[in-house]
A protein has these predicted regions:
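Positively charged, low-complexity/disordered segments
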Residues: 310-325
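PRPP-associated nucleotide enzymes
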Residues: 1-310
Length: 325
């Protein structure tokens, strides 16, 4: 883009599929970034075009492994050293978000550490979606634009025109999120009370509420091994639910998740494309968040341009009317 005051969008390796759709929505080309991998496992990044004085948006979800976070940090560092005006990290899925507090002695708080790493690397702003805990925004010393997948999930659910709908939360911790959907549709809220034997293993689960002859929609922020959500679906079906489907923001779907979903009572499970889903499961559907992120980038850039123009006007006026001019 030739305008000196324009923005540029670049993508890490793992999120290129989404960055291309964001750029298509914005009507701009995806910037040229090269990731070089070395034989010892290290890698480096380089911008193949000038970004001096530009606002740079770096798209990269920090999943499925730590290489994606490291790649993002290197992108930020390279942008800072190349004299970018503002560096905005666009992280649709923020990994390590489940490590947001000390739930037992002598454990790390991974979410705070990752926030510190991004800040020290040099970001001026973060755009993300559906953090596991809203308070993670406070871990950053820079502005955080926290988006919600409900922007694409709600219209999809409306298009289904489900009668006798009930919104369900797979655990007590997610009740606030699920209640937002229940209020929007004006329908009852059902809770699942679960106990875990260990991480990713549900020991027992009870339903709080009536699901008999209802079309149940389970709402969650992410699905990892799918143990909780498939167990909830099976129990609700046994309790007389007409249909059970699930909607979640982030498609982590690790380990046996795809097989569990395929063999469960779920009609379908709907995700956004914050994370690429490369496995095969007939019940998985992904909705794109590209337009939502593109609009956020557009608004962030509009505000940035307003501040820049205002600053230039003030500088010009002071220079023009200075008695020392």
């Amino acid at each position: 883009m030739s305008d000196k005051n324009s923005f540029l969008v670049f993508s890490g390796t793992n999120s290129r599929y989404l960055a291309e759709k964001i750029c298509a929505s914005l009507g701009c080309p995806l910037g040229n970034l090269v990731v070089t991998k070395f034989s010892d496992g290290e890698f480096g990044v380089s911008f193949e075009e000038s970004i001096r004085g530009r606002d740079v948006f770096l798209v990269q979800s920090t999943f499925p492994n730590s290489d994606n976070l490291m790649e993002l940090l290197l992108m930020i560092d390279a942008a800072k050293r190349a004299s970018a005006r503002n560096i905005i990290a666009v992280v649709p899925y923020f990994g390590w978000a489940r490590q947001d507090r000390k739930d037992k002695p002598r454990v790390s708080i991974g979410a705070k550490l990752v926030a510190d790493l991004l800040s020290v690397a040099g970001i001026d702003r973060l755009i993300t979606m559906d953090l596991h805990a809203d308070q993670i925004q406070g871990f950053f010393d820079v502005p955080v634009d926290h988006l919600y997948a409900s922007g694409v999930i709600l219209p999809y659910l409306q298009s289904l025109r489900l009668k006798d709908m009930v919104i369900a939360s797979p655990d007590v911790g997610g009740s606030k999120r699920a209640n937002t959907y229940a209020k929007y549709f004006g329908c009852p809220l059902v809770l699942c009370n679960k106990t875990r034997a260990r991480a990713n293993v549900v020991a027992s689960m009870q339903i709080i509420g009536d699901v008999k002859d209802k079309n149940v929609v389970i709402i969650d922020d992410m699905v990892d091994t799918a143990g909780t959500i498939t167990k909830a679906a099976d129990i609700m079906k046994q309790a007389g639910a007409k249909t059970v489907r699930a909607c979640a923001s982030h498609c982590v779907m690790s380990g046996p998740a795809s097989e569990r979903v395929q063999n469960s009572a779920l009609e379908e499970i709907v995700f956004t494309d914050s994370i690429p889903y490369t496995k095969r499961c007939d019940k998985v559907k992904q909705l794109t968040i590209a337009d939502m992120f593109a609009e956020t980038i557009r608004r962030v850039e509009d505000r940035s341009e307003e501040r820049r123009v205002g600053k230039e006007c003030r500088t010009t006026c002071r220079s023009r009317w200075s008695p020392y001019h």
